Structures are given as structure tokens and as C-alpha cells.
Amino acid sequence: QAAWTRTNLEILSMASGLCPRCSATIETKRHVCTDHGATGESCSACGGYYAVSVGFQCTNCIFSSGGAGVLALLSNTDLLDFLTDHGHNPVDPDSVRAVNELQMNYEERILAEDPFEAEFTFRADDETLTLTVDGDLSVVDSVRER
């Protein structure tokens, strides 16, 4: 659990635009697999499970990381509120598996390519949270529904 917590705090830092190693600014770059064909398995074109991925690069030190596009959203207050409302503490979880399941099992829908716009929908119990993002993966709309 200690390793998961450290990694999650690094992701929260990156999603907030701060390098978890030196505190400098992080540059965030969105990548979209245009030939994405994954449905439950990794895509043969990009190797990912989702079409949208993100790369993080420190502007000061050698730190870089990346992964699923949703990583850029993990510090969003609406998503954090959604997690805690459903009994999941993203910093000190009772169940790492439950938090991972909620954060990483989401629906992704690309609404437009130019300008880029996509939706990420998270589910917990009988409720959904849909975050709409722009080309910088900044949240431009947030909708919770039962």
C-alpha cells in the first residue's frame, strides 16, 4: 500500500502541473491513437487500452512519465469529490483495488478531433460522473447523474 500511495501522490502532483521530484512545472502532452481498436484488450496500433494517453515532462529535471489520458484528471476536484462520496479515499484508501477500479475503469468518448474534445465517464454504485475535456485535457464540463 505504501508504494501505491507514493505513486498515486506522484500522479496527483503531475496532474496538478508540478514535478513530483523537483517541484518545477510539468508539461502535459495529449496523444490520441487514430487507429484505436481496443475493446477490453490492448490496441494493436498503440498498445493502450484507451485511445487517449498523456505524457508528462518536467521543464527542469529529467523526470517524465505517462499513461492513460485519465491520469491528467486525477487531481480534478469533481473526480476527487466523486471518489470520496462513494467511500474511497484516493490518498489513503481502505482498498487500493477499489480506488483503482473506479479511476481506471472508465468510458472514453472522443467528441471532436479538431478542436479536440472528449468525455471520460466514471461509474460508482448507481451514479456516473462525466468529465468533458479540451485539447489540453483541462476539464470544461462536469456532469453527475443517477
Briefly describe each language-model feature range:
Residues 1-3, 8, 146:
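Long, charged N-terminal interaction/targeting segments
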Residues 2, 33-50, 58-59, 73-88:
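Short cysteine/histidine-rich metal-coordination sites, predominantly Zn2+-binding motifs
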Residues 5-16, 27, 31, 46-52:
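Short, flexible, mixed-charge glycine/proline-rich loop motifs
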Residues 11, 21-23, 47-48, 93-99:
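Short glycine-rich, low-complexity/disordered patches
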Residues 15-20, 41, 54-56:
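Cys/His-enriched microdomains
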Residues 19-25, 46, 59-62:
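Short Cys/His-rich metal-coordination motifs, predominantly Zn2+-binding knuckles/fingers
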Residues 26-33, 67-73:
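Short Cys/His-rich "knuckle" micro-motifs
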Residues 64-146:
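Long, contiguous alpha-helical scaffold regions
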